[in-house]
């Protein structure tokens, strides 16, 4: 039964249903497919889904690919902080405490 439920989510997410896209990403995450999960979260985030933005930010930081050495990475991190990602706040604090960062 789980296979058919996930197939239904896949079809809904491909048709543009953002909640289904997030659910599909969570399914990928649960099954160890981080890259596919990030793709789901990022696409839903870019279309304005707030939970997807939080999940995407957490994945970027937890997987260590949310580099903040670039302006784009810093903006993603600040967006994750804005929507309440505790891992993002910790990462930003360590970034701010580096000696080469100037306010």
At which residue positions do the language-model features occur?
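TPR-adjacent "capping" and linker segments in tetratricopeptide-repeat scaffold/adaptor proteins
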Residues: 2-19
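Short helix-capping/linker turns of helical repeat alpha-solenoids
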Residues: 16-17, 47-50, 62-64, 83-85, ...
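Hydrophobic face of amphipathic alpha-helices that form TPR/SEL1-like repeat modules
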Residues: 23, 27-28, 55-62, 94-98
